[in-house]
């Protein structure tokens, strides 16, 4: 069971999240309330049972899967909202389905402005997120220069750019630790960031308003991102604490300028971005707050 944070008024609308890939193909109603996530708290009336106990005033937020759009929701009275968080290049099919079947949802949360403008129940929402836990207990000791975390994936523009940079690093024996499932596996995400002053952060695709735990986790652990990704990232962070790159050549140049002195010159903005990142990290709470605010309008 999830750690329970109780809400004060048991009769207030409850807002819960169905975890990623947990929406069943059949019999949605059988999903246990214990399997849900409760970012804003869980009422006493819902401490046990399944989705049938939810009232028509309650709310569920889910990630997209085909059954979410097409299948019946027998015995489930709660409102259901959809949260599309992956880049358009990956979830373009779900964006198209959301336009067609938006009437099946209370709200549709997405960064895709075309989708939001085309439906009446769209709400702007960006992803963010984090892979870290117990951040205050992580020992941050910047004794190493730089890292690059990568998997073996190679289908999207960011994947390809990542591997191109890695080839360059290895060929010229540059002082950057290349780690991750595709190279040198590590146990915890923080192991690839906590001791490094810089990290080459390349999103899987470059899309407006799309940034992920790749960037958030670097900021949370006071690592300067050499960043390729959202072209409007300055809307979310103070980029004086970043090195923004738009190409392979710019990444190469940024790498050549790494130094202890440069890192120390950015400390003010590194600390500022750490605080900002803590807000962007909790995307589930932000999603639940959007639903809650809509009830008060």
Predicted regions located by residue number:
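Pol beta-like nucleotidyltransferase catalytic core
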Residues: 3-84, 88, 92-178, 182, ...
